[in-house]
Amino acid sequence: MIFGAAALGRAQDEEAAPILELLLEYGINHIDTAAMYGRSERRVGTWMDSHRKDFFLATKTGERTYQKARDQFHHSLERLRVDSVDLLQLHNLVEPAEWETALGPGGALEAAVEAREQGLVRFIGVTGHGTTIAAMHLRSLERFPFDSVLLPYNVPMMQNAQYASDFEALATVCAERGVAMQTIKGITLRPWDEREHTHDTWYEPLTDQADIDLAVHWVLGRPNVFLNTAADMSLLPSVFDAASRAGDTPSDAEMQALVERRSMAPLFT
């Protein structure tokens, strides 16, 4: 399990403190934040003086050029109150033109490699959203030996035949090369559309504990994948509780029944 610290994006210090206790209670030792996540890095930074050794710390840059990515990353270190992080990720490399810039000469990747050479970063990863991201991650791995990828994985997404095919191809390559496969959007119910936003997630999430159990157990039932938690503090206890009870992987019939019962729909089409 990975704590998706986007959940702290709008949190005050007094709201963030109980989250740390929750992470320690459930033994969650991987924090994933980003320069773009509002107050998140600063909130995580308040924990680092006394708890840096307890966590694998990951952040992201959304910049595409060397100088901007370098500057943004160094500001992240300041906000996080650390000398180094474990993982720096190039965030949301989906659009081909941005991909070419970030991974080309003078691109953000050069800043990440420099940071690793300077001992500021141990690993370099790439993240993204949407139906083409699995294919784009394969392309990224052809260009550079990234240590990790991050992308959506849930039942509605995997009912998209092309996405499922690309995801499986990516999973094969990751397994062969020892690339960490991090997944997001695990408890997505459907897009908000015109419905009232009742959570901080940018999709409508599953909220019933039994439904969250099925969704979380389905993701964690796949070997060699990590599950990143949703960007809403109120959902964390339910997700952590589900993960702590993970056992047998739900059957296809159980998951299809969940899809139909809750009218689940893919976030990306």
Predicted regions, residues:
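A short, structured active-site edge motif that brings together acidic residues
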Residues: 54-65, 87-91, 151-153
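Short, acidic/polar
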Residues: 11-24, 66-81, 131-141, 210-216
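Beta/alpha (TIM)-barrel catalytic core signal, keyed to glycine-rich beta->alpha loops juxtaposed to Asp/Glu
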Residues: 93-269
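Conserved, mostly hydrophobic/aromatic
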Residues: 3, 31, 44, 57, ...
